[in-house]
Design a protein with these regions (language model features):
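Gly/Ser/Thr/Pro-rich low-complexity, intrinsically disordered segments
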Residues: 1-383
């Protein structure tokens, strides 16, 4: 169904040119829940959308802190992430997201294997490479971003299997750059392509490349910040064996990029999650039994309108929505496409009132306080 212009809906607050906020109740299968929505008009040249993140992909901060640090007028939490490592005692959880991420047109990371992801079961036909993004043409889209990369050595070309991600495919090589942060890279060699709780690999190798030459190597993945101009290559199983053939001083060229499956327009912003609504229709097989606090983003008006959606985590409303109900609700709000983001204790929507110096959290996080998260969707206005 269609939706009225955002500023014509009763109870709507104008946050900035092209950005509005409202809240309302939803009667769902498990009870009444309360929703918060920020509507963004991407046709307004005062407005832009970008990734909120703490400056590294393996780091976390509360959404309000991410928004205020970046100067955003509104935002919601983003992708599902590596929140715990109880299945691998002694291995540090990275806090890094499942899916790809692009900020200000720069690719920050690629997606982990489907079997390594954190979060609820994916709907049929979706995967960790799915993204919501906004292109250089200021149009929002649902898409998929796959890694294309290589390591050129004196002996030939090796395929790159990972880029700044907390889990590498079995037998592969991953590249880690300064955007990764300082967290240990050991987790990248744990689990399998089908089971994130699988054992950590016993066959690993790490090579550090600086200014195009191998400068050091180690049998175990390391930790600590990676300097600009430096790439750390981490291999597991067959990937480790290939890296062992490199010698200190040898020339190595590492290349990586994210390739879209649908759009030829470069993305200025993108983050992972999974689609729940496409072309006005809920995806087949969406869960209609498990209700929870939810975060989602809708696309309307030919990709020129974004709807940031979050339900409330207060006790009175915590029954939440099923994923199937999220898809239906986003369609009722006017979305043609919609994308589910991390929910539960991560769900946070912030907005800055006109004239205020900082955002406020508009929903009640279900844990009683904001959960630090690795990324989010930020809305910016120059008006």
């Amino acid at each position: 169904m269609g939706a009225a212009p955002a500023d014509a809906v009763p109870g709507t607050t104008r946050l900035a040119p092209g950005v509005t906020y409202r809240q309302f109740d939803i009667t769902a299968a498990k009870g009444v829940t309360h929703a918060h929505v920020v509507v963004v008009d991407l046709r307004d040249t005062h407005v832009r959308v970008n990734l909120l993140y703490p400056g590294a992909v393996a780091a976390r901060e509360p959404v309000s802190q991410l928004a205020d640090s970046a100067g955003a007028v509104a935002g919601v939490n983003g992708d599902f992430f590596n929140i715990t490592e109880t299945q691998h005692p002694g291995v540090e959880a990275t806090g890094s997201t499942d899916g790809p991420a692009i900020a200000s047109g720069i690719a920050l990371k690629a997606a982990v294997p489907d079997g390594q992801r954190f979060g609820p079961a994916l709907p049929p036909g979706t995967n960790t490479r799915n993204v919501l993004g906004v292109g250089a043409d200021r149009v929002a889209r649902l898409d998929s971003l796959a890694l294309s990369g290589s390591v050129r050595t004196p002996d030939g070309r090796l395929t790159l299997g990972g880029f700044n991600q907390y889990a590498l495919p079995e037998n592969s090589i991953g590249a880690f750059t300064t955007q990764w942060g300082s967290v240990s890279r050991v987790r990248a060699t744990c689990g399998t392509d089908t089971n994130r709780a699988g054992a950590c690999s016993a066959d690993t190798y790490e090579v550090t490349v600086r200014n195009g030459r191998v400068v050091s190597a180690s049998n175990t993945p390391g930790t600590g910040a990676i300097a600009a101009g430096t790439t750390v290559l981490v291999g597991r199983e067959a990937g480790a064996q290939r890296l062992r053939k490199l010698s200190t001083g040898e020339r190595v060229q590492v290349r990586h990029r994210l390739v879209a499956s649908r759009s030829g327009v470069p993305y200025r912003f993108a983050l992972g999650g999974y689609p729940v609504l496409r072309n006005g229709r809920p995806l087949a097989g969406l869960d209609n039994t498990t209700s929870a606090v939810r975060t989602a983003v809708g696309i309307a008006n030919g990709g020129h309108r974004l709807l940031l959606f979050a339900t409330d985590g207060a006790v009175a409303y915590r029954s939440g929505l099923t994923i199937a109900e999220v898809a239906t609700q986003m369609r009722e709000l006017g979305s043609v496409d919609a994308f589910s983001l991390d929910g539960g204790g991560s769900t946070t929507l912030v907005a800055r009132a006109p004239g205020a110096s900082a955002v406020t959290v508009r929903n009640h996080p279900s844990g009683g306080a904001e959960r630090p998260v690795p990324n989010g969707v930020g809305v910016f206005s120059t008006g």
